Amino acid sequence: MAPPIVLHLSSARAYAVVMAVLLVLFLLRVVGQILAATTAPSWLPPMARWYSGLMPYRYLLPTQIVFLVVMIAMVVGVDRRSSPLGTLSATAGRWIVWASYVYALGMAARSIRYALATPERRGVLIPIIFHFVLAGFLFAYGSSVL
Protein backbone atom coordinates (compact mmCIF):
# COMPACT_ATOMS: atom_id res chain seq x y z
CA MET A 1 0.00 0.00 0.00
CA ALA A 2 1.37 3.40 -0.96
CA PRO A 3 2.07 5.79 1.92
CA PRO A 4 -0.40 8.69 2.04
CA ILE A 5 2.34 11.32 2.19
CA VAL A 6 5.79 11.19 0.62
CA LEU A 7 8.38 13.83 -0.10
CA HIS A 8 8.33 14.89 -3.77
CA LEU A 9 11.53 16.62 -4.84
CA SER A 10 12.89 17.35 -8.29
CA SER A 11 16.07 15.28 -8.27
CA ALA A 12 18.19 12.73 -6.46
CA ARG A 13 20.47 15.61 -5.45
CA ALA A 14 17.55 17.37 -3.72
CA TYR A 15 16.78 14.25 -1.65
CA ALA A 16 20.48 13.91 -0.83
CA VAL A 17 20.60 17.53 0.36
CA VAL A 18 17.59 17.05 2.66
CA MET A 19 19.12 13.85 4.00
CA ALA A 20 22.51 15.56 4.46
CA VAL A 21 20.94 18.37 6.49
CA LEU A 22 19.26 15.81 8.77
CA LEU A 23 22.55 13.89 8.97
CA VAL A 24 24.40 17.04 10.08
CA LEU A 25 21.75 17.71 12.73
CA PHE A 26 22.23 14.18 14.08
CA LEU A 27 26.02 14.60 13.94
CA LEU A 28 25.72 17.80 15.99
CA ARG A 29 23.65 15.90 18.54
CA VAL A 30 26.29 13.18 18.82
CA VAL A 31 29.11 15.73 19.14
CA GLY A 32 27.08 17.75 21.66
CA GLN A 33 26.52 14.66 23.76
CA ILE A 34 30.22 13.75 23.63
CA LEU A 35 31.12 17.27 24.78
CA ALA A 36 28.50 17.15 27.53
CA ALA A 37 29.86 13.80 28.73
CA THR A 38 33.55 14.73 28.61
CA THR A 39 34.05 18.46 29.13
CA ALA A 40 30.59 19.66 30.25
CA PRO A 41 30.83 23.17 28.75
CA SER A 42 28.49 25.66 30.38
CA TRP A 43 26.86 26.54 27.02
CA LEU A 44 25.53 22.99 26.57
CA PRO A 45 22.80 21.28 28.59
CA PRO A 46 24.21 18.76 31.10
CA MET A 47 24.65 15.12 30.07
CA ALA A 48 21.51 14.14 31.97
CA ARG A 49 19.46 16.17 29.46
CA TRP A 50 21.05 14.47 26.42
CA TYR A 51 20.67 10.91 27.52
CA SER A 52 17.57 8.86 28.32
CA GLY A 53 19.52 6.01 29.87
CA LEU A 54 17.72 3.33 27.84
CA MET A 55 21.07 2.10 26.50
CA PRO A 56 24.35 2.46 28.41
CA TYR A 57 26.38 5.29 26.86
CA ARG A 58 29.34 2.98 26.24
CA TYR A 59 27.07 1.14 23.75
CA LEU A 60 25.07 4.14 22.58
CA LEU A 61 28.03 6.14 21.24
CA PRO A 62 29.42 3.34 19.02
CA THR A 63 25.88 2.69 17.78
CA GLN A 64 25.48 6.36 16.90
CA ILE A 65 28.80 6.31 15.04
CA VAL A 66 27.68 3.28 13.04
CA PHE A 67 24.41 5.10 12.26
CA LEU A 68 26.39 8.11 11.04
CA VAL A 69 28.58 5.97 8.77
CA VAL A 70 25.54 4.19 7.30
CA MET A 71 23.70 7.51 6.93
CA ILE A 72 26.66 8.96 5.01
CA ALA A 73 26.62 5.93 2.70
CA MET A 74 22.87 6.41 2.21
CA VAL A 75 23.26 10.10 1.31
CA VAL A 76 26.08 9.36 -1.14
CA GLY A 77 24.14 6.44 -2.61
CA VAL A 78 21.00 8.51 -3.14
CA ASP A 79 22.97 11.40 -4.62
CA ARG A 80 24.77 9.12 -7.08
CA ARG A 81 21.88 6.67 -7.47
CA SER A 82 24.46 3.97 -6.84
CA SER A 83 24.21 0.53 -5.26
CA PRO A 84 23.61 -0.74 -2.72
CA LEU A 85 21.92 2.05 -0.75
CA GLY A 86 20.97 4.48 -3.49
CA THR A 87 18.98 2.14 -5.70
CA LEU A 88 16.08 0.87 -3.63
CA SER A 89 13.00 -0.70 -5.12
CA ALA A 90 9.75 1.21 -4.81
CA THR A 91 8.52 -1.53 -2.47
CA ALA A 92 11.49 -0.98 -0.15
CA GLY A 93 10.91 2.77 -0.33
CA ARG A 94 7.27 2.33 0.70
CA TRP A 95 8.27 0.12 3.64
CA ILE A 96 10.86 2.65 4.77
CA VAL A 97 8.37 5.53 4.56
CA TRP A 98 5.82 3.52 6.57
CA ALA A 99 8.56 2.69 9.11
CA SER A 100 9.32 6.41 9.40
CA TYR A 101 5.63 7.04 10.18
CA VAL A 102 5.66 4.39 12.93
CA TYR A 103 8.93 5.76 14.32
CA ALA A 104 7.62 9.35 14.35
CA LEU A 105 4.31 8.23 15.87
CA GLY A 106 6.21 6.47 18.66
CA MET A 107 8.16 9.64 19.32
CA ALA A 108 4.94 11.68 19.27
CA ALA A 109 3.54 9.35 21.94
CA ARG A 110 6.77 9.71 23.91
CA SER A 111 6.51 13.51 23.57
CA ILE A 112 2.96 13.49 24.90
CA ARG A 113 4.03 11.30 27.81
CA TYR A 114 6.88 13.76 28.44
CA ALA A 115 4.53 16.77 28.35
CA LEU A 116 2.00 15.17 30.71
CA ALA A 117 4.52 13.90 33.26
CA THR A 118 5.31 15.79 36.41
CA PRO A 119 8.62 17.69 36.15
CA GLU A 120 10.49 15.23 38.36
CA ARG A 121 9.34 12.27 36.20
CA ARG A 122 9.67 13.88 32.78
CA GLY A 123 12.82 12.32 31.47
CA VAL A 124 14.68 14.04 28.69
CA LEU A 125 13.56 15.94 25.61
CA ILE A 126 16.75 16.14 23.51
CA PRO A 127 16.72 12.44 22.50
CA ILE A 128 13.05 12.70 21.51
CA ILE A 129 13.77 15.65 19.21
CA PHE A 130 16.62 13.84 17.50
CA HIS A 131 14.58 10.67 17.05
CA PHE A 132 12.26 12.88 14.97
CA VAL A 133 15.35 13.91 12.97
CA LEU A 134 16.13 10.23 12.32
CA ALA A 135 12.50 9.54 11.38
CA GLY A 136 12.70 12.45 8.93
CA PHE A 137 15.88 11.00 7.46
CA LEU A 138 14.14 7.67 6.88
CA PHE A 139 11.14 9.49 5.39
CA ALA A 140 13.34 11.35 2.90
CA TYR A 141 15.32 8.21 2.10
CA GLY A 142 12.25 6.09 1.42
CA SER A 143 10.61 8.90 -0.55
CA SER A 144 13.66 9.20 -2.80
CA VAL A 145 12.54 6.17 -4.84
CA LEU A 146 8.80 6.83 -4.89
Give the role of each language-model region.
Residues T38-S42, D79-R80, A108-E120:
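Juxtamembrane "helix-exit" motif on the non-cytosolic side of transmembrane helices
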Residues M47-L54, S89-T91, L116-H131:
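Non-cytosolic membrane-interface motifs at loop->transmembrane helix junctions
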Residues L22-L23, L60-M74, I129-L146:
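Hydrophobic cores of alpha-helical transmembrane segments in multi-pass inner/ER membrane proteins
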Residues L25-R58:
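Hydrophobic transmembrane helix segments
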Residues L35-A36, V69-R81:
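Membrane-water interface of transmembrane alpha-helices
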Residues L9-L23, A90-V97:
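Alpha-helical transmembrane segments and their helix-start/interface "positive-inside/aromatic belt" motifs
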Residues R94-A115, I128-L138:
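Hydrophobic alpha-helical membrane segments
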Residues D79-Y103:
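Cytoplasmic juxtamembrane regions at transmembrane-helix boundaries
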